[in-house]
Amino acid sequence: MEVILIKPVRKLGKIGDILKVADGFGRNYLLPQKLAIRATKSNKELIVKQKYEFEEKDKQVREEVEKINTIIKDQQLVFIRQTSDDCKLFGSVTNKDIADKLSKNISYNISHSNIILDKQIKSTGIYTVEIRLHAELTSIVTVVVARSESEAQDYLREQKAETLEDVDETA
């Protein structure tokens, strides 16, 4: 299937690119998410005319996302959860939990699909989580999972001490 991208897609292309993609990928992801349109003759002519508009709209979105990104990058999200004796959670901290808490903290709606978890969070500790609000822009947020507020503060102190040690070693 041949498609024309109308939004930048990470690892695929930028606005206006004409690509051949698998039929299923095009039908089930790119077209429903309004990331691309079918590459018909009329759409190719239309995209040439509207490419500038799409790029301007993307530029505005990117500027807004950069402002949000400056707020997000300093966030430390603390989750207090019940655990077993060996610090395993009863359940897990999901990307939806992280999105909800982050949205509440910064007063901006963040979708759970923007949260990129390397693996499920199923035990206490400090985790770094990637937030992707734009195809070309990512943020890193610190997530602390603990049994109590005091334990969470201990984790944060340990991390700060380790960071200071790393700085001393490199100096």
Swiss-Prot record:
One of its GO terms (cellular component) is ribosome. GO terms for molecular function: rRNA binding; structural constituent of ribosome. GO terms for biological process: translation. Keywords: Ribonucleoprotein, Ribosomal protein, RNA-binding, rRNA-binding. InterPro entries: Ribosomal_bL9, Ribosomal_bL9/RNase_H1_N, Ribosomal_bL9_bac/chp, Ribosomal_bL9_C, Ribosomal_bL9_C_sf, Ribosomal_bL9_N, Ribosomal_bL9_N_sf. It comes from the Bacteria. The keyword Ribosomal protein applies. PROSITE patterns: RIBOSOMAL_L9. The keyword Ribosomal protein applies. Belongs to the bacterial ribosomal protein bL9 family. Binds to the 23S rRNA. This is Large ribosomal subunit protein bL9. It comes from Rickettsia prowazekii (strain Madrid E).
